[in-house]
């Protein structure tokens, strides 16, 4: 039986935390900032944790991620 491979696109977008959670960065950060307030832009810089409903599916793609 072959080993399951890590989904490389997902590996570039998520990092595992020390407690086993998954850290992600926010969407809507590449352009069109003139339509966003300073507060929105500031909050978009912060990382966020993966929601519990998505955790199981994303974890399956990142089987061998350290």
UniProtKB/Swiss-Prot annotation:
Write the record's keywords in alphabetical order, separated by commas. Ribonucleoprotein, Ribosomal protein
Signal sequence range? none
- Give any GO molecular function from the UniProt entry: structural constituent of ribosome
Task: Give the GO biological process terms.
Answer: translation
Region of interest (Disordered), residue spans = 1-21
Q: Which Gene3D superfamilies match?
A: 4.10.410.60
Q: Where is the composition biased (Basic residues)?
A: 1-16
Pfam families attached here?
Ribosomal_L35p
* GO CC, one annotated term: cytosolic large ribosomal subunit
Top-rank lineage group of the source organism: Bacteria
Tell me the InterPro entries matching this sequence. Answer: Ribosomal_bL35 (IPR001706), Ribosomal_bL35-like (IPR021137), Ribosomal_bL35_CS (IPR018265), Ribosomal_bL35_sf (IPR037229)
Q: Which family does it belong to?
A: Belongs to the bacterial ribosomal protein bL35 family.
PANTHER family, alphabetically? Answer: 54S RIBOSOMAL PROTEIN BL35M (PTHR33343), LARGE RIBOSOMAL SUBUNIT PROTEIN BL35M (PTHR33343:SF1)
**What protein name does the entry list?**
Large ribosomal subunit protein bL35
This protein's species is Streptococcus pneumoniae serotype 4 (strain ATCC BAA-334 / TIGR4)
